[in-house]
Amino acid sequence: MPQAAPREDRAARRAEVVAALSPVLPAHALLWHSEETVPYECDGLTAYREKPLAVALPETEEQVAAVLRTCHRLGVPVVARGAGTGLSGGALPHKLGVTLSLAKFNRILSVDALSRTARVQSGVRNLAISEAAAPHGLYYAPDPSSQIACTIGGNVAENSGGVHCLKYGLTVHNVLRVRGYTVEGEAVEFGSEALDAAGLDLMGVLVGSEGMLAVITEATVKLVPKPQLARCIMASFDDMRKAGDAVAGVIAAGIIPAGLEMMDKPMTAAVEDFVHAGYDLSAEAILLCESDGTPEEVEEEIARMAEVLGRCGATAIAVSQDEAQRLRFWSGRKNAFPASGRISPDYMCMDSTIPRKRLADILLAIQEMEKKYQLRCANVFHAGDGNLHPLILFDAADPDQLHRCELFGADILETSVRMGGTVTGEHGVGVEKLNSMCVQFSPEECEQMAALKRAFDAKELLNPGKVIPTKHRCAEYGKMHVARGLLPFPDIERF
């Protein structure tokens, strides 16, 4: 485990950084006292915590550029932060760095109903975009479970999805243009509101880059018309494999639902006790399948989905009869994470993906892992695109439980890759999945990622120590395990 920086060295570095940033930020926009930085010591992955030297809260793009230029000159790491709802430790502060909060970049700059676009600052909440577009009969499609709080800047950084991403796509499919600043404080703008095929797709590179390439300050996003009607099917299954086969069956039938989600029995019990959505507590698994469009389209698709689900062994099928019932069906899925927080002191949410045909296999494997690691796990996930969200329940105050939880999570990710999947679908790598990158990618592939990182950030100051494994890490996997969010030898050369 790394030794903490001597207190006097850290204090001296903080004094230097605060003195350098004070001329470029108002006094109220620079926090450095211990009690002021506590709210920024972690993101949604609360098991790992670290206080930054200081927190910068710029209000203008000029201030963002000035903070970045100053930190670049001093060689100070910078970790950009949106709402801090991420689940992989992507916004975990650097103990000798500055956290750059975009919380004050919260203005919706324009909503254009004719072009069906919205131009927003990066600190705007995901749901606020849909609220602003609602008077025009439009909304923003990507809808992560944290949409009431998460920001568009964080969504861009993680390439977030949501329960409706199967039909409407991830963030990368719904963003037209991004604006931001490099680590040297230079403005960059990628993408266009018009068809843009010239050059390399640098916007595609920036979306999902986890704050490692640039700091996003603004985005132009697509808006889509609200459907005339949406209805949801809730299907119960007495066997996990039947439920998994039903997911594959729906897609194989040529149906692309607006949403196709799955919950296992432990998760169903947790959310039903929390929101009383009317779930079947005797079911081993529940599927939520949504159709939207014109009334005629919805009626036909609902009938087709119900037929497939019944053929695959559903023991009960309920169809929402009005908007209130549809929202009640979805309330359990949307509240899965807070419901889990009610039954466990802590949880760690994995985010691997799996081919749909292997859903039952991975869920049964996770059940065996529960016995191996002596920890409970509740499963909820985007079944339509095979994006798993197993929530491992544990107590972070118990070091042994945390260690077993980390091993459990790594086992899920490795098994997912072995079954043809990936280590993350939308939550990002952060620090949580750093080891597991070596399971999915070769040293040569990691070298290409590192080379791209250096092209944007030669000093490697933006969100360092995350996403890309350290040099030779793939060969050393198992000897350099991330524990409690800390990495031995954090300053080792990266590829």
Label every model-predicted segment.
Residues 1-69, 86-116, 145, 265-276, ...:
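N-terminal flexible segment immediately upstream of the FAD-binding catalytic core
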Residues 26-27, 417-429, 452-454, 458-467:
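Alpha-helix capping/hinge segments and adjacent helical runs
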Residues 31-41, 221-225, 231-408, 415, ...:
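C-terminal substrate-recognition/cap domain of FAD-linked oxidoreductases
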Residues 88-106, 134-138, 161-172, 219-225, ...:
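A glycine- and small-aliphatic-rich helix-loop capping segment at beta-alpha/alpha-beta transitions
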Residues 107-261, 462, 478-483, 489-495:
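FAD-binding subdomain of flavoenzyme oxidoreductases
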Residues 186, 435-495:
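Activity-critical C-terminal alpha-helical subdomain
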